[in-house]
């Protein structure tokens, strides 16, 4: 039975993610901060919620910045929400924070004056929104284009390499909702809260061989 490591650095909705993975039959799901267990896992999930400064402080304290770079190179890897944002070069949040740098680009604030067709939009962007599939990818299998997923975020990803953007969202402006590079895939939305389509994405991740 394959092992899925859900990385625990104290800043994630870990049990919901683990429960959803178990629900789709992903295998043996372990919530862990043990580097040895993470290195030996067949698949890696990197969730996250909260302020990016706190997240990055814990990630660096535990040595997960280099570990994540290492283990994501040769097996399926999934970043979720702030776990995705931590993979970028930097974030504007908390006055500016350097991140892991797995994906080139910056995490930016939606702003307090966000509008769509004359209507003021509340920040954070919270609730269901469509994701346009920019390219075909194994993790989109059996998920229709423009499917709705659940988002909660005040900061969005401005990707520097548009070829890595495999899903796009829109909330007053366009943003990267999903990024991919080799065996690495990351999403801004919460698949574990996104009902049928979110569970399908997790099921696809559990079956994915990491090639793209």
UniProtKB/Swiss-Prot annotation:
Chain's role: IGPS catalyzes the conversion of PRFAR and glutamine to IGP, AICAR and glutamate. The HisH subunit catalyzes the hydrolysis of glutamine to glutamate and ammonia as part of the synthesis of IGP and AICAR. The resulting ammonia molecule is channeled to the active site of HisF.
Stated name of the protein: Imidazole glycerol phosphate synthase subunit HisH
A Gene Ontology term for the protein's cellular component: cytoplasm
Active site (record annotation): 81, 190, 192
Associated pathway: Amino-acid biosynthesis; L-histidine biosynthesis; L-histidine from 5-phospho-alpha-D-ribose 1-diphosphate: step 5/9
Name of the coding gene: hisH
Entry's localization field: Cytoplasm
GO BP term (any one): L-histidine biosynthetic process
Subunit structure as annotated in this protein's UniProt entry: Heterodimer of HisH and HisF.
Any GO MF annotation of the entry: lyase activity
Occurrences of domain Glutamine amidotransferase type-1 (ranges): 3-212
InterPro entries (alphabetical): Class_I_gatase-like (IPR029062), GATASE (IPR017926), Imidazole-glycPsynth_HisH (IPR010139)
